[in-house]
Amino acid sequence: MAEQDQNTQQAGGDAPSFNLQRVYLKDLSLEMPNAPHVFLEQEQPQVEVSINVGGQRLAETVFESTVTATVTTRINDKVLYLVEGTQAGIFELANIPAEQMDALLGIVCPTMLYPYLRANVADAITRTSLPALHLAEVNFQALYEQRLAELAQQQGGNNNGSDSGIILPPGTTRQ
């Protein structure tokens, strides 16, 4: 019986493992360069939103994944407010096949972090006493696929099948 338990533990030691260890707000800034004059404006503001994904290896099986949102709201040429926030998470990824690693870091991790970022950005904007702005849902798989297509186009498409097209975060290497 003890031998069976030991065999089960050994087999489980090689099983793929994906765990979220911690979620934290890495950076949040809000600027209102034209306050208080912007409170007198009656026009509808123009909103620009930019979303970026990043990551880095912290240890052999530990990665930091980040999602950054930059929201710039303008009325004519005046900046109403500028909010930039970075939500981060520490993930443990063990025994994950190399061909799946980039997709986990580029799609799954950001998808888990984004709701926290949305809430933090919305809270910051609400504190300006201006009308609330809630960021729309983001399809991180589509962003990931777009990034892969852009990289393939930059490389001129002369892949020759020798590379899988996997993009790893800075500081990581393929196993």
Curated annotation (Swiss-Prot):
GO MF assignments: unfolded protein binding
Chief localisation class: cytoplasm
SUPFAM superfamilies: SecB-like (SSF54611)
Annotated localization: Cytoplasm
Cross-referenced Pfam families: SecB
GO BP terms, alphabetized: protein folding; protein tetramerization; protein transport
GO cellular component, one term: cytoplasm
Swiss-Prot/TrEMBL keywords: Chaperone, Cytoplasm, Protein transport, Translocation, Transport
Cysteine disulfide partners in this protein: none
Region (Disordered): 154-175
Function: One of the proteins required for the normal export of preproteins out of the cell cytoplasm. It is a molecular chaperone that binds to a subset of precursor proteins, maintaining them in a translocation-competent state. It also specifically binds to its receptor SecA.
NCBIfam families: PRK05751.1-5, secB
Record text on subunit structure and interactions: Homotetramer, a dimer of dimers. One homotetramer interacts with 1 SecA dimer.
Family from the record: Belongs to the SecB family.
Protein name: Protein-export protein SecB
Organism: Bordetella petrii (strain ATCC BAA-461 / DSM 12804 / CCUG 43448)
